[in-house]
Design a protein with these regions (language model features):
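Short, conserved micro-motifs composed of acidic
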Residues: 1-142, 146-149, 156-159, 165
Length: 167
């Protein structure tokens, strides 16, 4: 179970903690802090662990678009996660965005709570559904000699995304 709490020994504000249930002892084990890759001196709240063990949560301790923003951290092993990544617009807004969940079997369709007003919200906490489109872009590159401005033939350009995908 991953949860948010303001326990002693944290990084400040509310941190994300993990605890496991011991079936033999019929009790929860002592919680462990998820560490500095996740927690900040602000508040980390509303954790959600997806089917592929990606951790989603909201925080006001990272640089974001405003208020609480939704972040994700990819699993790096047994109950550990990499650095938090801001999900940006359109998931995040200048207002509070939190409580993200995805539909079963999907990493594109889900629901989020937000106090945004740009989508007809009332400025209070409203529930929105979303369907993230595949990212598509076009890139034109001209590689030339700096001094002669002549095109250099046979150049290969490799574009690498933050998820290490290449094009």
């Amino acid at each position: 179970m991953i949860f948010s709490a303001d326990f002693p020994g944290g990084y400040g504000g509310k941190d994300l903690w993990i605890s496991e249930y011991d079936k033999r002892e019929d009790s929860w084990l002592s919680p462990n802090n998820l560490g500095a890759d996740i927690n900040t001196d602000g508040d980390e709240m509303f954790p959600y662990l997806s089917e592929n063990n990606t951790l989603y949560f909201s925080s006001n301790g990272y640089i974001g678009l405003g208020g609480l923003d939704v972040f994700k951290a990819e699993s790096t092993g047994d109950k550990t996660w990499g650095n938090a990544e801001n999900l940006q617009y359109p998931i995040n807004s200048p207002e509070h965005d939190f409580g993200i969940i995805f539909e079963r079997g999907s990493d594109k369709r889900g629901y989020i709570t937000s106090s945004r007003v740009d989508l007809g919200g009332k400025g209070k906490d409203d529930l929105y559904n979303f369907n993230l489109p595949e990212i598509q872009f076009s890139l034109s590159v001209f590689v030339s000699n700096k001094e002669t401005n002549e095109q250099i033939p046979g150049v290969t350009i490799k574009v690498t995304g933050i998820d290490t995908s290449t094009a």
